[in-house]
Regions:
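The conserved acidic donor/metal-binding loop of glycosyltransferases
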Residues: 34-38, 60
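Conserved donor NDP-sugar-binding/catalytic core segment of glycosyltransferases
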Residues: 44-71
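Glycine-rich, basic loop-to-helix element that forms the pyrophosphate-binding segment
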Residues: 8-25
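Short aromatic/hydrophobic "clamp" motif used to bind/position activated sugar donors
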Residues: 30
Length: 185
């Protein structure tokens, strides 16, 4: 009764699939998830506590291998993550599967910019949320994030991007963020 299956009839790939899912989400609060990650038992409760006073939250993650054996206690420590709009723009270092947010975030986030190579769902949602909404970091690992070769969004493939690509990527996102400022929703 509460589970609905929606077929993505548009573009395919992980970013368009997340966009399709978000367009069809009906709840007041939205939690992103990857198919192979494990939520900690207190994830929903911890996020909802923060969402009482924030519109967007991102938590830390325990990094595990494909057999669920711990590799690192903190994704954010491993990546040297810093929260906030400018820090996010300079160095994208959060996992979309650690996001939870109020529905109103979608009013600025959707539709996603069309160039999915230059705009992944998690980076776009983090930028929109930290630019336009009250956002917070939860310093607790609320998921067990599996890191192995089969990840669809493995950070390893972005490690070899040129500096020119990284500048182009950020300018593309800034251009679309400015567009969201100019459009009344």
């Amino acid at each position: 009764q509460n589970i609905h299956i929606y077929i993505n009839k548009g573009d395919h790939g992980y970013t368009p699939n997340f966009e399709n899912a978000l367009r069809n989400a009906h709840g007041d609060y939205i939690f992103l998830s990857d198919q192979d990650d494990i939520w900690m038992p207190d994830k929903v409760e911890a996020c909802m506590k923060y969402l009482k006073v924030n519109d967007f939250v991102v938590s830390d993650a325990l990094i595990v291998d494909g057999n669920n054996k711990p590799l690192f206690d903190s994704f954010c420590e491993q990546r040297k993550s810093k929260f906030g709009f400018l820090n996010t723009l300079i160095r994208f270092s959060y996992l979309g599967c650690c996001f939870a947010f109020r529905r109103k975030v979608l009013s600025k986030a959707l539709p996603f910019p069309k160039n999915h190579i230059l705009c992944t769902h998690d980076n776009w949602l983090a930028l929109v949320s930290t630019a336009f909404y009250k956002s917070a970091f939860i310093p607790l690992p609320l998921i067990r994030y599996r890191r192995y070769g089969g990840n669809a969004s493995s950070g390893a493939k972005n490690a070899n991007k040129s500096i020119l690509f990284m500048i182009h990527y950020r300018l593309y996102l800034l251009f679309h963020l400015i567009g969201r400022c100019l459009v009344a929703k």
